[in-house]
From Swiss-Prot:
This is Nucleotide-binding protein Shal_3708. GTP binds at residues 56-59. SUPFAM superfamilies: P-loop containing nucleoside triphosphate hydrolases. Belongs to the RapZ-like family.
C-alpha cells in the first residue's frame, strides 16, 4: 500500500493537493488524527493500494518523539511518502483576508497574524522530517499539480482521452462538448444525387470533400488550434476532452471531418474515441 501524508500550514494548499490525489485514484481522508492512522490502514488493507491522509495543527501530537513514532510504526507493506506545504506569512495573511475564512488557531485573544506565526513555529518539527517540502507562495494550482505529479509518477505526461463527435444541428447540439465547430458553410455532398444516400464514411463522399481546398484548410486550422492548446488543457488536469463537429444533418461533412481529425491525433500520445451521433453502429 502506498500512503501519502499531506501536512503543512493552513492556507498553503493542503485541500487542493488532497483533491489532486483523489483525481489520481487515492482514497483520501481529510484531517485524520495520527493515532487513528494505523487503524484506518488496517481497515483499508485489501480494498485499496493508494491512500492519502491530510493532517493539520489540531490533530498532531505535541511531542516530536510521538510524531516520529506514529510515522514509523506503520503496518507491514505500507510505503509512506510525505509532503509539507508552506507559504510565507505575508502570502498566508493575504489569502485569509481574501477568502475571509477563519484560521484554525484564531480566537478572541489571537489575531490572524499571530495565529499564522504560532502555527508556523508549531509545525517546524514536522516540516523538518517530511520527504518533500513545497513552498506554494508563488505557485498556482497547476504548478502545484505539476510538481506533485512529477514526484508521484516520475513525469508530467498525462494521458488525455479525446472524444471526437459528429452531429447534425437539426437534431440538436451536444451538451457535453468542450469545443464545437460548425461546418455547415462547407460544400454539401447532400446536393449531389449520387452522394445523398451515403455518409462521410463512404469513399465517394470523402473524395468529394477532399478535393475542396477550403475543406482541407479548415481541417488544418482545427488541427493547429488543438495542437497549440492541448498541453495547456492537460495542465488543467483534464481527463476528457470532447470535440464536436456539426453539419446540417450529421451525415456527410461532420462525419468526414471528425474521421480526419481522429486519424490525425491517433498518432500522438492521446487515447481517441470517435462517435457519430446520427449514424448507427459507426462509433469506434
Amino acid at each position: 500500500m502506498k500512503l501519502v501524508l499531506v501536512s503543512g500550514r493552513s492556507g498553503s494548499g493542503k485541500s487542493v493537493l488532497l483533491r489532486m490525489l483523489e483525481d489520481l485514484g487515492y482514497y483520501c481522508v481529510d484531517n485524520l488524527p495520527l493515532p487513528m492512522m494505523g487503524t484506518l490502514l488496517k481497515e483499508l488493507s485489501g480494498n485499496t493500494n493508494l491512500v492519502a491522509i491530510s493532517v493539520d495543527i489540531r490533530n498532531l501530537p505535541e511531542k516530536e518523539s510521538e510524531l516520529i513514532k506514529h510515522l514509523t510504526n506503520l503496518p507491514d507493506g505500507v510505503e509512506l511518502l510525505s509532503f509539507f506545504l508552506n507559504s510565507s506569512d505575508e502570502v498566508l495573511l493575504k489569502r485569509y483576508n481574501e477568502t475571509r475564512r477563519l484560521h484554525p488557531l484564531s480566537h478572541d485573544n489571537v489575531s490572524l497574524k499571530e495565529a499564522i506565526e504560532i502555527e508556523g513555529r508549531s509545525l517546524e518539527p514536522l516540516a523538518n522530517i517530511v520527504d518533500h517540502y513545497i513552498d506554494t507562495s508563488t505557485l498556482n494550482i497547476y504548478d502545484l499539480n505539476d510538481q506533485v505529479r512529477e514526484i508521484l509518477l516520475g513525469n508530467l505526461d498525462k494521458e488525455l482521452m479525446i472524444n471526437f463527435e459528429s452531429f447534425g444541428f437539426k437534431h440538436g447540439m451536444p451538451t457535453e462538448a468542450d469545443f464545437m465547430f460548425d461546418v455547415r458553410f462547407l460544400p454539401n455532398p447532400h446536393w449531389e444525387p449520387d452522394l445523398r444516400p451515403m455518409t462521410g464514411l463512404d469513399k465517394p463522399v470523402q473524395d468529394f470533400l477532399n478535393e475542396r481546398p477550403r475543406v482541407n484548410q479548415f481541417i488544418k486550422q482545427i488541427e493547429d488550434l488543438l495542437e497549440t492548446w492541448l498541453p495547456d488543457l492537460e495542465r488543467n488536469n483534464r481527463s476528457y476532452l470532447t470535440i464536436a463537429i456539426g453539419c446540417t444533418g450529421g451525415q456527410h461533412r461532420s462525419v468526414y471531418i471528425t474521421e480526419r481529425l481522429a486519424a490525425h491525433f491517433k498518432d500522438g500520445k492521446h487515447k481517441i474515441q470517435v462517435r457519430h451521433r446520427e449514424l448507427k453502429n459507426a462509433d469506434h
